[in-house]
Amino acid sequence: MTLREMNMGEMDSPNEYDFLKIAIQRGLVTEQDEIAQFKRIESGRKGENAFAEIIKQFAQENWLFKRNLWLHDFSDFECDYLLITTHCVYVFEIKNYFGKFEYRNGQCKSRGVAITYNPVNQAHNATIHLRNLLGGVPVKGVLVFVGEHNQVVIHDDIDYIDILCRNDVYQYIQDIISEEKQSAIRIDTQSIISKLRNQTINNPYAIEPFASADMTEENSGIFCDRCGAILTMTRKIYINCQCGFEEYREHLIIRSACEYSLLTYGTNFTVSAIHNFLGNVLSRNYLKSILQKYFTELPSQKILTFKNSSQNNVNQIVFDKPNRIILHQNRSYQ
């Protein structure tokens, strides 16, 4: 089954995880506190991805979803995962903790250490805000502890949100399906989407983009999309990495250009900028032809310039050849 993702018309700022991953790889971010912050974000992203895969596997095809949606209702708040069925709206707060999480008297501890943020309150607040925005539409708040090695102990009575562990998610989805079939309620999905769009905001904590001048020779080059190793550009159709990943040459070029677009979001880019970003390893004419093939040119520019937008996503582009992983047995797999 294929869930449908809602288009809420957000602005073009990238998410912090993608931005920092590329910036750290290219040496644009080197401070240890920023790298530690990235590790925390990475853990959260892995948890959200794991949850999204479970939902995708078992959800109904007529349901709608949106990840990491920022909304405003007197104050700004984020919905980690918003799910709209035909009878109810569900807002999921997702936590990827390791070890024991304990909740007692409104206080949280993770592996015996008190933590300042309160995921129970986060889930409850998002639920209250959504109910305010959507009027009489049924809204349920759910806190999901998705960590594989996470023990959750809740001492307090909590009846205002549902609390799940990873192994509970499948059955929770089955319960939603059963409730949907039995419910006499049918909500107006288009009205809900319209209300949400009116209150959608860009991430208020968006990070500052880099300028083209920030990109030096030290930050240039090409990297493996699978393991992050530095690669050597060749004239072959596929660029090989020692990890076994073979990336289609055009895919590698466009992926790198998309990474540049992300790091400098809000600013359009030129052939020269991408040429430098790749480490000057391609002829300008060849690079120009590839960029013209996949990106939108801006008219009336003295220098050939391409539009930088959130649509510059290599995963949304269809290439005429696939990437490959070559195993020791010399068999290739998509």
What are the residue ranges of the model-derived segments?
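Active-site beta-strand-loop-beta-strand hairpin of nuclease catalytic cores
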Residues: L83-G106
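Catalytic centers of nucleases
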Residues: W70-V91, K307
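Short acidic, glycine/Ser/Thr-rich loop/turn "cap" segments at secondary-structure junctions
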Residues: R104-T116
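Residue-level signal for tight coil/turn positions that link beta-strands
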Residues: T86-H87, K236, Q301-K302
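Short beta-strand element of the conserved SAM-dependent methyltransferase core
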Residues: L83, I239-C241, L304-F306
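Short, solvent-exposed alpha-helical "recognition" segments
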Residues: I290-P299
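Surface-exposed interaction regions that form or flank ligand-binding interfaces
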Residues: M1-F77, V113-R284, K288-S289, S310-Q334
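Short Lys/Arg-enriched helix C-cap and helix-to-coil transition segments
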Residues: L298-V314
